[in-house]
UniProtKB/Swiss-Prot annotation:
The lineage of its organism: Eukaryota, Metazoa, Ecdysozoa, Arthropoda, Chelicerata. Residues 1-28 form the signal peptide. This is Evasin P1132. Keywords: Disulfide bond, Glycoprotein, Secreted, Signal. Salivary chemokine-binding protein which binds to host chemokines CXCL1, CXCL2, CXCL5 and CXCL8. Disulfide bonds join C41-C60, C45-C62, C56-C73. It comes from Ixodes ricinus. One of its GO terms (molecular function) is C-X-C chemokine binding. Glycans are attached at N44, N59. It comes from the Eukaryota. It is found in: Secreted. Its main location: secreted. GO terms for cellular component: extracellular region.
Length: 106
């Protein structure tokens, strides 16, 4: 009896988790007006003997895990496209790539 109850609870949790993952995935796909980007700055940061971390250059920030002595310098940017006006048809047409030109021999 206990085995059947335990198996039933495992199946119920599995179904609930699957539904949650599906709903979270479809919600993330509908957020086309927001963009969060992360770029590696090409350098690492290290924990010094004093407990402080070396600084990253430019717009980069040191991100590290607890207990580790080496971190990554990363640049993060959040863009909310709802703050920008919708482009007009003319602006969209002007932004299209130009067709390839064929090279001519002189």
């Amino acid at each position: 009896m206990e085995v059947k109850t335990f198996a039933f609870l495992q199946i119920a949790v599995f179904i609930a988790l699957g539904a949650q993952i599906f709903l979270a995935g479809t919600d993330a796909l509908s957020d086309e007006d927001e963009l969060f980007s992360v770029e590696y700055c090409g350098t690492n940061c290290t924990k010094q003997d004093t407990g402080s971390w070396t600084t990253c250059s430019g717009n980069c920030t040191c991100y590290h895990e607890d207990g580790k002595k080496v971190g990554l310098c990363l640049s993060t940017e959040y863009t909310d496209f709802t703050k920008f006006p919708k482009p007009t048809s003319e602006e969209i047409a002007n932004a299209r790539p130009l067709p390839k030109r064929e090279k001519t021999l002189n």
